[in-house]
Amino acid sequence: MTLPRSLRWTGDHLDLLDQRCLPHTVVYRQLTHWREVSEAIRSMAVRGAPAIGVAAAWGVVLAAKAGDDLDQAIEGLRASRPTAVNLSWALNRMQTSAKSNGWVDVHQLERLASAIEAEDRALTQALVNHGVGVLPEDCRVLHHCHTGAVATAGVGTALGVIVAGHQRGIVKHAWLDETRPRLQGAALSAWELGCCGVPATVIVDGASGLLMRRGQVDVVLVGCDRVAGNGDVANKIGTYNLALAARAHGVPFYVCAPSSSIDITTVDGDAITIEERPEDEITHFRGELVCASGVRAWNPAFDITPAHLITGLITEFGVIRSPSRESIASLPFAN
């Protein structure tokens, strides 16, 4: 089965795959205003750090076509989700381009948004090619959240490595954390691997340590929303727990990090803003209260995994073993 594209630019509007409707229904939303793009990012109709960066770039194009204040549109899009650096990465490029002539060149912005989308396709493919090289033969991979094709404009990051590894006869099985509270692993990763013919089993997030203890995990692969200059990683809540369990059981722990997710200007993980989402994502399920009435919930969307727990960062340039400030600063884009 061919996976649907995460987004499609038509020339006058953005068709956006609504990931909230997956896995049961494929629905595209027709977005004609940058505020609609911002709301789609905030509500997680589009999610995955690379995908939201590309979507935001097209949001700027929509603002330019409408004659809206571009600075206001860019800052509105930037505020939609604060943790993933891909969002600011794309918006900063669009803002620089918009100001380069002293006037708004809509066609120039459209070409740049198209280039950002094409770059994501190319760099995710390069990342996947490098990632397959770290996999042991006949391996069982544990994955957290969702990092597949619909979370990018291309083939995905960590999940893309799993798919490619299976196609090459290296990956035997994938374990998928369900990833509370939004269930991206159960709803999206399981669906995507099923479409690609990869054998997979969904587990509750708390089962990963037991799997490792029993020797049923050979490698952990995750994505990221931001890598700080020292190698600390912000990723979906629960990633830090996985890294601790992997270290305790001697399981390699790799983070797939395209250069658009690496922020050398952020000193370390403590400097990364962690998005906190609504309490009802935890207290309610499909609109029904599942907690005792009046119980409060804390819902950070991300956590920080320190660099010393990471076996390697898989980038489009290659694999950075034991990431550090020095090794990240040596990457081509950092100079």
Curated annotation (Swiss-Prot):
The active site is at 225 (proton donor). It comes from the Bacteria. The record marks 145 as: Transition state stabilizer. It catalyses: 5-(methylsulfanyl)-alpha-D-ribose 1-phosphate = 5-(methylsulfanyl)-D-ribulose 1-phosphate. Keywords: Amino-acid biosynthesis, Isomerase, Methionine biosynthesis. Catalyzes the interconversion of methylthioribose-1-phosphate (MTR-1-P) into methylthioribulose-1-phosphate (MTRu-1-P). This is Methylthioribose-1-phosphate isomerase. It comes from Synechococcus sp. (strain CC9902). The gene is mtnA.
